Amino acid sequence: MSIAKDNEWNEHDSDHIARTKYNPMEHAMDVEFHNGSVYRYHGVPPIEYTRFLASPSQGYYHADNIKSNYATKRIK
C-alpha cells in the first residue's frame, strides 16, 4: 500500500482510530480518535506510516509501534 496524498485525512475502519493524515516533510502523523481527540506524533518516518496503513489492525499497530515510540502532543 502506498502513502495516501500528503496532508489529506484517511478514514479507517478501526474501533478507536477514526482517521489519520501524514506530513512527509515534517514526519508528522496526526491521529483523530472516535472520541474527537487529535494527537500529532513527531519524527514518524514515511515507511512507518506506510506500514501503519498496510496493517490489518491500525489500532493495534498504533498502540504497539507509534504511541510509545514517537513524541506526541494533543492538538485537539
What is the predicted function of each stretch?
Residues 1-76:
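Acidic/histidine-enriched, beta-strand-rich ligand/metal-binding domains
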